[in-house]
Amino acid sequence: MALLQISEPGDSPAPHQRKLAVGIDLGTTNSLVAAVRSSVPEVLADAQGQVLLPSAVRYLDGGAVRIGREALLEQARDPLNTIVSVKRFMGRSAADAAASGAPYEFVDAPGMVRLRTVQGDLSPVEVSAQILAVLRQRAEDVLGDDLVGAVITVPAYFDDAQRQATRDAARLAGLNVLRLLNEPTAAAIAYGLDQAAEGIYAVYDLGGGTFDISILRLTQGVFEVIATGGDTALGGDDFDSAIVAHACAGEDVAALPVADRRALLVAARAAREALTDQAQAPFEVTLRDGRAIQATLTRAQFEQLAEPLVGRTLDSARRALRDAGLAVGDVRGVVMVGGATRMPVVRQQVGALFGTEPLTNLDPDQVVALGAALQANLLAGNRALGEDWLLLDVIPLSLGLETMGGLVERIIPRNSTIPVARAQEFTTFKDGQTAMSVHVVQGERDLVSDCRSLARFELRGIPPMVAGAARIRVTFQVDADGLLSVTAREQSTGVEAAVAVKPSYGLSDDEIARMLADSVTQADSDARARMLREQQVEARQLVESVGAALAADGDLLDPAERATVDQRLQAAAQAQSLDDVEAVRAAVQALSDATEEFAARRMDRSIRSALAGRKLDELA
């Protein structure tokens, strides 16, 4: 497959100077590291031959830490100090984390939730760094040298806060992040090289804790993500919880000790995985009070439990297709990613929706890491002939800024391919204005109050001018990792201010879904609200300019004219607070009509003043 290259700045190394770079799939349930060896991507195993590293960290009294399989085996015995599925808490607040029902003690802290352990309060970034450090050491042991960097995969629906948290975890682990790569895109790289196929593809990624659906167009080596969707709080863990609720019907599971709840989830996962190949599976747990919970779960029962969860993923898939302007029949194939896609009920329902057998010839647990390894190899400069491609990911929600009246000016629309930079010019609202506040927002609605605030900063040092004369260019840049920076620059002086957007915590899936749904259902009311705000802003501008003109040249009006203008001016000032767009428009028009002759007289005076004392030949 002939592909095009987007490469990082810098000189290309000589052929013999091969640099070691890896791809890392930092997963909710398991994590992996892969590298390209002898031009072939492969997942790297530990000393025991295991390629999957359970994403589990246990903190012991005295400072010792257990990571991976050893920690996983001890989670039922020490649940509060054994952190699993930490990816769910990346970039989240304490309220978000507590709502997940996870059996931990959450501590709210500035910026991000922390988890209380015997070694103190730890952030998800610190826990994730422990997992990444093990993978880094494994790679260096297997490859025999230090790494120049890593490509780390993230769910496509991760927002700025969650992506930044992932980067921070990598830095703590001593890793140089070459790029954050969306998991579906990584899978497309792996499958694209094997299949050499063009057309529309869906990547269905159901992991331990997150779900992503991406619609990609593959054309002559260009991987373009044309729409994304998903659920950052839905994965295999939720199927396990459904099994527990079924097996423990009549039992108040939430009231059980943490260790019992963890043991129930472990048994549920074992049953779910057994049902992949068997018609039924046992569910047996002995609680700490000696009671035994025993049940036999059939595949038919499990499919009934799983149906609403799988249905949520299919709803996301339909929304992504609508966003891309495509029908189900336009999709040529479906790539399955994530260990949870091994469930027969998932494969059956996905196949039924798209009318085609899902692609499963690559290990769904490994495909993301393999694609990340290929991308890391390229970014490190180790490319061979024909090993280049162009990656085009998209942003999930529109980015914009607040304008007068609390309106949103959309700068980068959702589903724009990244990296992307867009700029727009704005001006001042008042005469002599020397500063401007820039409020960056995210969302699909027309009013700032209905969108999510991302950042605020001020541009100072604007030269005093009449309103509307200054030119301020605001530039939005989203890099290849999906991280946003905003710059405001006054054009005549070059004075500049900027901000790198790092929200305090991420959007929940419910918030994302609500923002997208509201943009459709509230479209008419948003349009009416926008018209009203725009008319109110126009009224305010006219009232201020007429007031300034009267103060400067009020003597140009006779008493009757002045009385009329004052009356219309007062009416327009009062109209600014009205909720009737037609009433505001009428008041603006009335004031404009009343001051038309006044404006002409002011212009005449200005011209006479400019020409006073000057000779005709001086004007030639």
UniProtKB/Swiss-Prot annotation:
InterPro entries: ATPase_NBD, Heat_shock_70_CS, HSP70_C_sf, HSP70_peptide-bd_sf, Hsp_70_fam, ISC_FeS_clus_asmbl_HscA
A Pfam family reported for this protein in Swiss-Prot or TrEMBL: HSP70
Entry superkingdom: Bacteria
An MF annotation (GO) of this entry: unfolded protein binding
BP-aspect Gene Ontology terms: iron-sulfur cluster assembly
UniProt KW ATP-binding keyword: yes
Keywords noted in UniProt: ATP-binding, Chaperone, Nucleotide-binding
UniProt function note: Chaperone involved in the maturation of iron-sulfur cluster-containing proteins. Has a low intrinsic ATPase activity which is markedly stimulated by HscB.
Stored HAMAP family: HscA
Family as reported in the entry's similarity comment: Belongs to the heat shock protein 70 family.
Record's protein name: Chaperone protein HscA homolog
Organism: Bordetella pertussis (strain Tohama I / ATCC BAA-589 / NCTC 13251)
